[in-house]
Amino acid sequence: MTARLDPFVPAASPQAVPTPELTAPSSDAAAKREARRLAHEALLVRAKAIDEAGGADDWVQAQLVSKGLAVEDLDFSSASEKDKKAWKEKKKAEATERRALKRQAHEAWKATHVGHLGAGVHWAEDRLADAFDVPHREERARANGLTELDSAEALAKALGLSVSKLRWFAFHREVDTATHYVSWTIPKRDGSKRTITSPKPELKAAQRWVLSNVVERLPVHGAAHGFVAGRSILTNALAHQGADVVVKVDLKDFFPSVTWRRVKGLLRKGGLREGTSTLLSLLSTEAPREAVQFRGKLLHVAKGPRALPQGAPTSPGITNALCLKLDKRLSALAKRLGFTYTRYADDLTFSWTKAKQPKPRRTQRPPVAVLLSRVQEVVEAEGFRVHPDKTRVARKGTRQRVTGLVVNAAGKDAPAARVPRDVVRQLRAAIHNRKKGKPGREGESLEQLKGMAAFIHMTDPAKGRAFLAQLTELESTASAAPQAE
């Protein structure tokens, strides 16, 4: 859906503007938060009273009676003109108060109900929306250890949010006056830029709850190594060490291709209710947006469908769970063709080792072309796309890198998977220059060098410790040196 910005009034073309920087909260922010909290508690008390009264209409009538504003019917045939006039005045007062009480009842209802989540989002408030459910939903939820959350109010309480705040975070607008995310770009190896979209603190805290209590409890395939406890770029690389052929395939637009509807489907299959799945899928996704000025107002305009943001804590875990079937199919394909398969986020790696093949296959060449053709078929069938420019085939005798580590067969004392030599040489040269009092490269800091040393330590602890010790010594020397006046 494309939003329409008042076409009846001529205006200048929208101008793209940078996302504004966050400003520090004002001194009375705490007082405003407390006032909002008290107002919300009052709404919850009112909502409870309405439920106990039997509904909004019964509560309104009871309030009118308690205030002495409920007016009984009048027999106009026997009433005097004076009584008629007085009765009409009372009815006006009753009607005015009834409208005010109905507004109050609606405010209380909004504090405990979602109601609407924006254009293109189906939302059913009642709990009967699961009448046509996925098979064995309750059993799936129990098997995955998922908490049964049967209402928006229960979910909001678990997240530490009010229902109105939950609705605000989940509500989808094509054009919005505010955004729950902060975006910036970082350079990629090929010179292009990657956009990072990170949620603001309160939404990030809610997403972390979703990650811990929902996403991380969903099943993940053993071939997945990224963002999985106990696995890393090292475990991913070690699966391919000493191979004769390494094939790397990259998935294009990995996070943006996972829309909120795909996330909802994943959560439904995991055992969550319809409403809970809808709210959590919207809470974990956002549309890519561009900030524009329109008639003096800053607007955030959606440029595409709502999908996983690269920068949200939930995104990697959701893709791991969503790729369960993809990983199963690619693992089976790899096994049939004699390959080993692993996945680290959007990086798919296959390796073929002659020594691991059955004797009849050892004289055959690895079926790389067949593998690549069928990988593309499986990837597309599972809703993803292969990046046409990032497929690499590295044979024995050329440098084979997997998730940044070299996995070629190495000497007796060398790690099976190791940091490339040029990185080690770069760190060694940087330390040498600093010891000689020479300035580092532009933008180079001790913290960055320590990060490189820690990277080396992961694959070669002895070498990494030696580099870290030298950097610690340099840091101590720098802090002890007299500061120039």
From Swiss-Prot:
Q: Name the CDD domains on file.
A: RT_Bac_retron_II
Locate the Reverse transcriptase domain: which residues? 167-407
- Enumerate the GO terms in the molecular function aspect: metal ion binding; RNA binding; RNA-directed DNA polymerase activity
Q: What happens when the gene is disrupted?
A: No production of msDNA. No other visible effect on growth, morphogenesis, fruiting body formation, spore germination or cell motility.
Q: What class of enzyme is it?
A: transferase
Coiled-coil region: none
Q: Anything known on activity regulation? A: msDNA synthesis is inhibited by rifampicin and chloramphenicol.
Catalysed reaction(s)? DNA(n) + a 2'-deoxyribonucleoside 5'-triphosphate = DNA(n+1) + diphosphate
Q: Which UniProt keywords apply?
A: Antiviral defense, Magnesium, Metal-binding, Nucleotidyltransferase, RNA-directed DNA polymerase, Transferase, Transposable element
Q: Where does Mg(2+) bind?
A: D250, D346, D347
SUPFAM superfamilies cross-referenced by the UniProt entry: DNA/RNA polymerases
Q: What is its EC number?
A: 2.7.7.49
Keyword match Hydrolase: no
Superkingdom of origin organism: Bacteria
Which portions of the sequence form the region Disordered? 1-33
GO terms for biological process, alphabetical: defense response to virus
Q: What does the UniProt record say this protein does? A: Reverse transcriptase (RT) responsible for synthesis of msDNA-Mx162 (a branched molecule with RNA linked by a 2',5'-phosphodiester bond to ssDNA). The retron transcript serves as primer (from a conserved internal G residue) and template for the reaction, and codes for the RT. The retron is involved in antiviral defense.
Q: Which family does it belong to?
A: Belongs to the bacterial reverse transcriptase family.
Q: What else is known?
A: M.xanthus contains two independent and unlinked retrons: Mx65 and Mx162.
- Identification of the protein by name: Retron Mx162 reverse transcriptase
What species does this protein belong to? Myxococcus xanthus
